């Protein structure tokens, strides 16, 4: 009976939320991931009647709902909605310096705060947000799509956008898929913990095995091989391990890649039931890591934070997935294109930028030795072409998250939050243009989308010479995509960069 009441309430809420724009919209985004959320905000700001459907209560995906509230990369490339988001965080916490609370990132924040910022941005843009529900059926129509939601609500849309974490909508509508995946990256069930100031009752998780965690840091139980564990990872001190993901409010993000809570599973090949059990096991693995910290390393005052996620167990709504099904798009971004951007014309269609290395997580994979060449592969900063968002053969449809058409190796960089947000913003601009002009997305010239993105302070190319708002920024970006000026990229440790004019002291 209770389930029936919940379903009825969900249907009523959907109907009420849609009443302001009717059951027909210009742009419908399924999945409130980081990219999907940005797509919705951008589409609405460009005048499109926009609705986003998200199964959790929060927008933001990996940034918020999955608990990865430490941004990887693009610190010197803060433009567009990504820059607006980080500026809002800085304002909340008292400046950018306050966001440097942990050493994994220059920008850390409480996931709840991030979700609040994104929801405010979406509401301010006029996005209709249907949270706590999901799409159940997709039917192609002459002018777009008809989508049936949980509870039976139907929405008609001209442009449908996949903003899910795993590319579920792309699979459901039959979009062609790239088949180059060797193995899924490890996922992580993140936990946000806090110090309660007194011992916390710790229950041993089902299947707990402390040997899985003994090499997470330098401790008497670890196998220390000249400062490294048997997997070749540096053994940091326990204090450094915990300060890695310390948030500005003192909470700690447990997302530690050294024999901790990374978890391997081929989750893209699983049924819904299999994935549910996999998620349960990934949770137990993370709870085992926390139990190890509490009982073996003496951090007995740490416990799952009770003031972050509105979930029964206090954990995020779902895991941090580093891999999705990737469409076969009108463009495919490759590592070779990142390393040699002027060997093709992809740069002329640039719509988003990134500067993070090829960060592949495979340490928990039994096949890790054959995949070792992928870990932190060097590339310069790069741009992403518009065609990665557009499937080759599926009409009225775009992707806005990790389902973009990039090769499997390149996904190690494009999967990161700032790049996904940039791709999502571009997808929103393209969706709005396509809906308004009644053109297929593949018929819209990249230059039209680029003009909108430049209007909104986005980087098209990762030139560090000028930043948004500087005199000449727009002109430099426009000349860049026309090939009138070209940048020189380089990889310096974790600081990948591109300059039109290298600094004189270099």
Can you describe what each PLM-predicted range is?
Residues 465-476, 480-505:
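Extracytoplasmic Gram-positive cell-surface binding/anchoring modules and repeats
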Residues 13-24:
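Bacterial Sec-dependent signal peptides at the C-terminal "C-region" and cleavage site
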Residues 36:
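N-terminal Rossmann-fold NAD(P) dinucleotide-binding loop
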Residues 1-10:
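Bacterial N-terminal signal peptides that target proteins for export
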Residues 139-154:
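Conserved beta-strand-loop-beta-strand element in the redox core of flavoprotein oxidoreductases
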Residues 21, 62, 115, 153-159, ...:
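Flavin (FAD/FMN)-binding glycine-rich loop and adjacent Rossmann-like elements that form
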Residues 23-33:
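Beta1/beta-strand and adjacent pyrophosphate-binding region of the FAD-binding site
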Residues 42, 48-49, 54-137, 141, ...:
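Conserved N-terminal/central alpha/beta ligand/cofactor-binding core
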């Amino acid at each position: 009976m209770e389930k029936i009441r919940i379903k009825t309430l969900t249907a009523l809420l959907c109907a009420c939320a849609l009443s302001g724009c009717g059951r027909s919209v210009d742009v419908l985004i399924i999945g409130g991931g980081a990219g999907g959320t940005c797509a919705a905000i951008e589409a609405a700001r460009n005048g499109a009647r926009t609705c986003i459907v998200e199964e959790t209560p929060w927008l933001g995906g990996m940034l918020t709902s999955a608990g990865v509230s430490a941004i990887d990369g693009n610190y010197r490339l803060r433009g567009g909605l990504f820059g607006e988001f980080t500026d809002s965080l800085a304002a909340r916490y008292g400046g950018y310096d306050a966001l440097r609370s942990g050493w994994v990132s220059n920008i850390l924040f409480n996931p709840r705060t991030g979700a609040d910022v994104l929801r405010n941005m979406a509401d301010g843009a006029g996005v209709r947000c249907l949270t706590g529900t999901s799409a159940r059926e997709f039917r192609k129509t002459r002018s777009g799509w008809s989508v049936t939601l949980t509870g039976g609500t139907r929405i008609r849309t001209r442009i449908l956008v996949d903003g899910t974490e795993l590319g579920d909508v792309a699979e459901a509508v039959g979009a062609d898929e790239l088949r180059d995946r060797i193995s899924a990256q490890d996922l992580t069930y993140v936990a946000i913990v806090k110090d309660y100031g007194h011992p916390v009752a710790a229950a041993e998780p089902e299947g707990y095995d402390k040997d899985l965690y003994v090499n997470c840091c330098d401790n008497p139980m670890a196998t220390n091989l000249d400062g490294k564990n048997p997997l070749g990872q540096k053994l940091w001190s326990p204090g450094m391990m915990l300060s890695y993901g310390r948030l500005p409010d003192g909470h700690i993000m447990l997302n530690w890649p050294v024999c901790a809570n990374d978890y391997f599973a081929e989750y893209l090949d699983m049924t819904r039931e299999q994935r549910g059990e996999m998620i349960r096991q990934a949770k137990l693995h993370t709870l085992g890591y926390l139990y190890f910290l509490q009982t073996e390393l003496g951090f007995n005052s740490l416990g799952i934070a009770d003031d972050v996620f509105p979930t029964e167990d206090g954990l995020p709504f779902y895991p941090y997935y580093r891999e999705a099904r990737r469409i076969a798009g009108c463009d495919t971004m490759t590592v070779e294109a990142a390393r040699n951007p002027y060997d093709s014309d992809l740069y002329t269609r640039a719509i988003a930028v990134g500067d993070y290395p090829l960060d592949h997580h495979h340490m928990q994979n039994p096949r890790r030795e054959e995949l070792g060449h992928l870990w932190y592969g060097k590339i310069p900063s790069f741009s992403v072409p518009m065609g990665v968002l557009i499937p080759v053969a599926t009409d009225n449809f775009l992707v806005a998250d990790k389902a973009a058409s990039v090769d499997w190796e390149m996904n190690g960089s494009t999967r990161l939050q700032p790049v996904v947000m940039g791709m999502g913003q571009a997808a929103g601009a393209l969706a709005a243009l396509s809906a308004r002009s009644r053109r297929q997305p593949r018929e819209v010239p990249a230059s039209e989308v680029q003009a909108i993105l430049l209007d909104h302070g986005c980087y098209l190319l990762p030139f560090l010479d000028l930043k948004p708002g500087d005199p000449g920024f727009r002109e430099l970006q426009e000349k860049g995509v026309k090939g009138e000026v070209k940048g020189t990229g380089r990889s310096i440790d974790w600081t990948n960069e591109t300059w039109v004019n290298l600094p004189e002291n270099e």
